[in-house]
Structures are given as structure tokens and as C-alpha cells.
């Protein structure tokens, strides 16, 4: 049968689409599709992009990925893909894919910080990397090195990084880019529930009556989930309600029954308005039994700062930055804050001194009466006036929308799901606003129930599965454990077979502080893995200069030359998703594994291999002796204890951490891997010359399986249970905790969660035990020294409205919001290499209200400068596009390195979660 490529593509697409929706496929189309797929091998895998976790089928032929389609058997996406998902194959074969290590060298071929990039061998790359690491490590100790990790690590990669950096090098300066996207959600989960990650699952979409999005443009950022929302809405348009709360109109508004455009930061006030409506005007709606049996009321300090440098006159600040920087020490209360902080005895014009009482867990129990008192100012009139974000909308219209919003939550029999992503997380009070969502759902008893719950959606494919569950944050260990807790360190040392006292008890530098420490000379070696920190971090002009400081050495492991690679000193070419084994964990706690489909391109190698090879270059005697952390802490010499465990000071970290006797018991030849590549285990046909200059022939044991089986010991029996390695390769993922082979759909609900049943506290049990001992007090402060244990209960927090540190002014009159677009992923490092996606959206635009553009004398598509106190970028204006901003606000996506918008953004963070607020700063815009 002969037919054209065009005919084949049409028939294959038709067959796939028909299969996805359950239609029968015409025999001719099916025959054409099968003919075109001769010699293809299909295997299940996972999409490389967002946190939805779509299952895909990957086809290989002649050692190349030749096609990708949605997996009809995958429960998340049911055969559908979004526009990015369909191009999973093409991200791997961009024209400028990195294929060899690149080092800055002089004319003699020697490393030179001011030299140009030239290809070098893996041996040369690791020789220089080792020397530079040891220089920083020997001079500054474990605090002198840092690793930018990722929510795009595979689970095994993240676990290996945590074990190497924290267990091997005894440094906690490992922090993922998930700090930028999920840290506020994490902090709120831990403070509220005592355990991380959502209670519900995606099935809530089909089971609910109401979907309310808060700072979540799901139509573009989680399009497959939005397809499910759309299907639910259209199934019963009159009953099912969709509400979109945002600071600008976006595609999610197209389906919404109500669109609420609010002023940046005032989501804090809107949540409190809803709670006030419940408590003051509809007390009958409170689920008193749920609240009494399963919750307590709590609050915390407000003088927590804004997560900027505490040295407000830091030498590296530009003079233009100083007025905003000063708010880290104190601020004058605005008129709005004079109302919302009245319960503290403060008024507008008072000066609040920032005492930085922002440690997670620094809160206390209050009475319901105090909680009610604190909500009193958040009347409909006050909140509507404060929060109305569209000056062209009448106040009465906005008030009517807020009332309808509250009524939907309050309606007794109505099921409600609240979804949010970066709009709430990237927020200088991100932890607070996350906690407010639970406040409302708890009051109504609409949490941890099928079809009802507050649901934080993850942005990255394994921000949950790796960054959070594995513990690649600077303060965490696997399974919600933390470095500061001696019991948690003891558990980790036992599983990792480390001498007692090896692990560093002091929290490391978080993502933003790794940048600041590079600028200050406190960190002199940084390794970038699976992300692009120099493009994704606010106030970027500072960090570009820091990277090029002569004393700093930057290593970037990447597949393409993004901004971070360009400012680095050494670039390591890295295998991409289907060129390695791995696993991701998505937003509904679903863990999914895949097999390596093809060998990496050129001489690129997997991150697991890179870390393993680097670990070979360090002997125990170099890293496990006494190590000074600061003036108060010196880590003990554990070499004698290591000897007692059978280790030698001459042993390498590779031998102890990754190639020990247990690891070697995982046989190289495994039925799961039969017929598939496994570069780390066997090497591959490329015969890559490895870090020792010899052809790499593999480790001879199944390192990925070993890493998985060791890792899951941390969570089993503790509410984080995972299945064994083989099981995941037979299923389309499982939602943890996986107990007796069964996944858990709704946590904390005894009907569905075996841990909740085991607790024996009734229908619900919020069994997380972190931060569950707290004092009692009033709205001002704790009043008891004694701490009271909280068992199987969650916390209902009161958190007030406070202004962000930077707001529009006469000089910088516009709000700036940043974010993503449907067609591109994060910094565009992968998707900008896909011709179809590049042609669809070739550049980042400055979305602006037509009247704002008219005032500036700017027409559609004309170039403007977007300038803040920190920097400026040039972009073309769009007044008609997908993102329709209100007067006074502009939106610029960050995927385009030529429109380097993070030069403009403020590096303020939530002081509790340390997550950067990319959603609000002040700018001026003028014609270029």
C-alpha cells in the first residue's frame, strides 16, 4: 500500500483521535496507520512538561524517537495531549543540542574564566570541575558550594543529588527551582496539616459542582485538566459553576460563569471576606462537628518582612533599589493596613518594625472568638473597594460578584474545588494565602471529600514527586523529614548507612540565597541541574554579575545553551527524558515510571551518571572530617565511626553511597529492562570516553532500581508509602500512599485512606505530625510557655491582608505580572527549539490595556521599554491578544531570553516559604 506522508499523518491522527474518544476506527485508516508504523516500538512514558502528569506513548525506530501520542490508558489525560505534549519528541533534536562538554579556555587550552567555550573530554571537564569544587570546599567548607536542583529532576536524580550533597559533602546548599513554584504550598501544607501534598485528586473535577480558580490560568497552564473541567461544565451548564479570580483576563475566563479581576495581593482580603460571610452572616453554614472534631484555630506574627536582604544598604544594591529594600527593616502602614491590622492595636501611619518572626511553625492556638474578631474588618464594602482590579467595572458589579462567590462556597449541598497555582504561591504572603484557602474549606467541612477541597496544582512534572517527596529543598530530607530534627537525621543516616553525626543540622541556603551568596563570595562553586536559574530568578542583573566574578565557578548540566549555560564556566551535555530511566510524581500524588528508549545524542550523559562519576573523585577522608559551618557549629569528624562500619578513609563517595554491596545486589539484567537501553548499567553503542578517559562500559548493576528501592524505605509505614519498582512499570502510575498494593484517592478521609482509618479518630484524621505541638495565646502573641500536642487535627489560620513591598507610584505607575503561555515551557530552553511552537509564539509580548498604550502613544506591535528600579527590557506591545489586562497592569511572559523580564522583577519572597513573588512589582513603560 503506497501513500504519502501527508496521508499517513492524517490517518494516524484520525485513528489516534478516534481511539481517545472511544470511536471505532475505519478499517482503511487503521490499515494506513499500521503500515506507516512498521518497525516502530511503542512504550508508555510520561510527558516532560507540566505537573499534570499526562501519560504518553513513545515510538522509537532506528534509535530515534519518531512519534508521540497520548496514552488512552492513562487515567490523567485519557489519550489527549496539549500542544506541548505532542512535541515531546522534537524537544530532543534541536539544532543546537549540546553534545560535548564545553569549558572556557585560553589559547593554550587551559581553563580561563575569561576564555571562550571549547569542546573538551569528559575527563578534562571533571578534572577542572573537581579542582574548582575542592578549592571552594577547602576554603569555605560545606557552605561554600551550592546546587540549583529542580522540580524536573527524575525521582532517582533528585534522590541521588540529596544523598550526595547532604550525605556525602555534608552541605545543605541544595535547593530546587520548585522553590520558585511550590514552596508556599509546601509551607502551608506543613503548617496546616503537618504533612505535605494535596488531599484530593483529579477525580474531584468530575465529582464537583463548582470549580474556582485563584491565580491559576488552567486553560493554558494545565490544559488537559482544563479539558476535563470544560467537559464537566458542559455536562450540566446550569448547575456546574466556574469562577476565575485573576489580576487580568485570560483564557480561563472564557469558560467562567463569573470573572473576578482583583488588584494584586488583595486575594488575602477576598479570602477573609468569604470567611467573614461564613462566620458573621451565615453561621449555620459552618460544619461545627467537622471543625470541633478535626480543627483548631491559629494565628502567627505579622512582622515577618518580605524575604529581601536584611542588610538594607547592601553594597551591591543600586541606589534606585534602596527605598524598597528599606521595607525589609520597617514600613509605614497604609490606610488599608490600618484597617486590617487594627486587631494588633495599630493604625495607618504607624511604623511596623520587621522582627522577621517568619520561621515555619512559629504560630499558636487562638479561640474561635479571637478568630471571629480578626475577621471583622473584612466587610463586603471594605474588601470590594480595596480589591476591585478593573477600574472600568463599577463597584456595585464587583460587590455583586464577591457576594456570589461567597454564596457558592456557603451553599450547603454544593461541592466546591478551589484550584490555584503561581498566582497564590508566588506571593510575598504566599504561605498565608494558601492557608486561607484551607480556612474557608475547613469552616464549611468541604475538605478531603470527593468533589470538595482546596487543591494546589503543581507547575513542574516532578515538583511533587522529587523536590518535595525526595526532599531536595535546603531544609528537607525525604518523606517530609527535615535536617534540623535530630530524629530525622538519625533515620536518614541509618537508611543511607552513614556514621552518626554525618548530616549537617543547619538549614542550607535557599534558591534566592544561593544567588545572593554567590554575589557575596560566601558560595564560590555552583552546579546547575535540570533548570535555568539565571533566566528564572528575579533581579537577574545582580546574578549575571555574580556568575562572572573571578572567584566563582559555575557548572551547568543542560541539553541546550540557555542563559545559565551562557554565564557558566563549564557546560556538561545532558541526556533528556527518553534517553534515560526515570520517574515523576504529579500534582495528585501519582508516581509514574518510564524506561530509557534511546541512547543520548552525541556524548551527552544522564545526570545520574554525572553525579556518580563526580562522586568517584572524593575520598571519605576529604569530606567526613571535622567541617566548620559557622562560628556556632562545626560538624564532627566521623571517620572513626566510619571505620567501625567497615569503611576506609580511602573509600570514595561513589563506593559508599552508590556502589555499595546492596546496590550491587540489583542485577544488571532485569526483565523490566529487557530490550531497552540502560546507559548507566551497560554503557551503550556510542562508547563514550568517561570521566577517567576510558570507554564507559556501565556500572554492572541496576542503579536506578537500587536508588528507587532504597528511597521508598523513607516513606513506607509513614503515610508516604510507594510501590516497588517493578509494579510501576506495569501500571499507569499510582497515587500514594500505596498500601497493600492499593492507591489512595482522598487522604485524611477514613473511607479512602488507610492511615486515617488506622488513626481511629472518626471520619477524618489529619495525621501529619509536623508542627503539631504549639502554645496557646491571643491575636497578639502566644501566652503559654507550654506547648500542647495536636493529634489528628488540622489548623484553621487567621492571616491578615498586608500590602506588597512594591506598589505603583508616580515614577513607576504600572503593575507588572509575569507568567507563562500555553505554547512554551518555563524558560523556553526546550520549546523554543521546536519549530512549530516557535512559529506559533516566537517572542514574549508586553500585554497592555489599549488605553494605557494610547496614553503612551504606542500602537499594536510597536516596541516599548519595560523598566523598574532594577532593570529594563524591550518588548513589543499586544493590546488585542489572549491576555487582556486591566488599566494599570502589564503582563510579560518569561519564556523568551531575548525579553529577559527577570531583569525587571523584584526578588522579594514569602518570608516563611522563601518563594519569590514574580506576580507583582512596579514598572514604567515607554516607547522604545
Swiss-Prot record:
Cystine crosslinks: none
Cofactors demanded by this protein: [4Fe-4S] cluster; Mo-bis(molybdopterin guanine dinucleotide)
Keyword Metal-binding: yes
Record-listed Mo-bis(molybdopterin guanine dinucleotide) binding positions: 84, 152, 177, 181, 214-221, 265-267, 422, 426, 532, 557-558, 580, 607, 818-827, 902, 919
GO molecular function, one term: molybdopterin cofactor binding
Family note: Belongs to the prokaryotic molybdopterin-containing oxidoreductase family. NasA/NapA/NarB subfamily.
Name assigned to this protein: Periplasmic nitrate reductase
Taxonomic path: Bacteria, Pseudomonadati, Campylobacterota, Epsilonproteobacteria, Campylobacterales
